[in-house]
């Protein structure tokens, strides 16, 4: 996973901004999260988001717009408890965000295929403060974390 993230970061840094500001800009965004749940259990998440930014004004420069980001995320979350085996979940969610914050709804899936609803909220740009609520059957669990993401515009990478 580290090799793939390093490669994606290198690709993203290799291509600069081409000055074009299309209405839709598809992107791919790898991310890594570290955090604690309300019981002080450490967790780590690795994810990949596919999405698009939408320019919601007719301004010429992207910086003069209020872009909206829509995305679909797929990831893995691991919980590390003392003297217990690591518990792994797959997850997916759909999210909407503006530049400095957003929300998402989705599901965690355990190794037996059971699903649990997950709501997530974040603030920040490439470094995010996160808050998740996971609904494990009758129990709601709160998660707090730090997330690093690196959005890469697909068309600028491919056609630059």
Describe these PLM feature segments:
Residues 21-31, 118, 122-130, 160:
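Outer-membrane beta-barrel proteins and related beta-barrel translocases across Gram-negative bacteria
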Residues 17-67:
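Short glycine/proline- and aromatic-enriched beta-strand/turn motifs that initiate or cap beta-hairpins
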Residues 32-46, 78-89, 107-118, 134-144:
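Solvent-exposed loop/turn segments connecting transmembrane beta-strands
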Residues 46-50, 141-160:
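Outer-membrane beta-barrel "beta-signal"
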Residues 4-13:
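Sec-dependent N-terminal signal peptides
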Residues 47-51, 93-97, 120-122, 147-149:
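Outer-membrane beta-barrel architecture
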Residues 30-36, 72-80, 94-96, 103-109, ...:
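Transmembrane beta-barrel strands of outer-membrane/channel proteins
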Residues 54-62, 67-71, 99-105, 125-131, ...:
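Repeated loop/turn-to-beta-strand initiation elements of outer-membrane beta-barrel proteins
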């Amino acid at each position: 996973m580290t090799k793939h993230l390093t490669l994606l970061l290198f690709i993203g840094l290799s291509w600069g901004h081409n000055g074009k500001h299309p209405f839709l800009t598809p992107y791919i965004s790898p991310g890594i999260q570290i955090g604690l749940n309300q019981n002080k259990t450490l967790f780590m998440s690795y994810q990949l988001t596919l999405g698009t930014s939408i320019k919601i004004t007719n301004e010429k420069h992207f910086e003069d717009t209020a872009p909206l980001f829509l995305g679909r995320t797929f990831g893995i979350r691991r919980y590390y408890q003392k003297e217990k085996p690591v518990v792994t979940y797959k997850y997916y969610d759909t999210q909407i965000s503006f530049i400095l914050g957003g929300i998402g709804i989705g599901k965690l899936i355990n190794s037996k295929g059971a699903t649990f609803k997950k709501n997530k909220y974040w603030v920040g740009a490439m470094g995010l403060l996160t808050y998740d609520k996971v609904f494990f059957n009758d129990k709601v669990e709160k998660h707090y974390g730090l997330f690093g993401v690196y959005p890469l515009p697909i068309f600028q990478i491919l056609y630059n």
